[in-house]
Amino acid sequence: MQMFHSKQSLLAGSSYTEVVKYARKEFNTIRKITKRQPYVRSKYFRGDKIFITIFWDHLMQKNRKERTKRLKLYSAAIDLLRNSTEAPETIFDNTNRDVLLHRFYGKTSDGIEFCVQVKEDKRSGRKDFMSVFDKKITK
């Protein structure tokens, strides 16, 4: 399994309100560039758009501590989506055959390993940035 080495580090801050300020600032810079829905272009998917609004909806379903952990990895996740050429781990959803889940693995400049999950609709080809989280090491 190949890992993408991001040039970004964790976002600064120890509380949710501090971290969300930096994450929203980065999100708003992406949003201002696009006309309709915010997206980033991915090198792995040959320049296809990966929409990032679903991430925020998914994030608000988590508790405050988990939100803070995930938001700290936000800038590294965006860097991975834009620049990674490493092949992801692809998971086929048994309940919905039209959905593929791609898991990209990366490492921040601080050395923290993380996982980015992208959902792809096979019918339309639409790709959505779903989630970012710490990679749990299981032995």
Show where each model-derived region lies.
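Ribonuclease/tRNase effector modules and their secretory precursors
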Residues: M1-K139
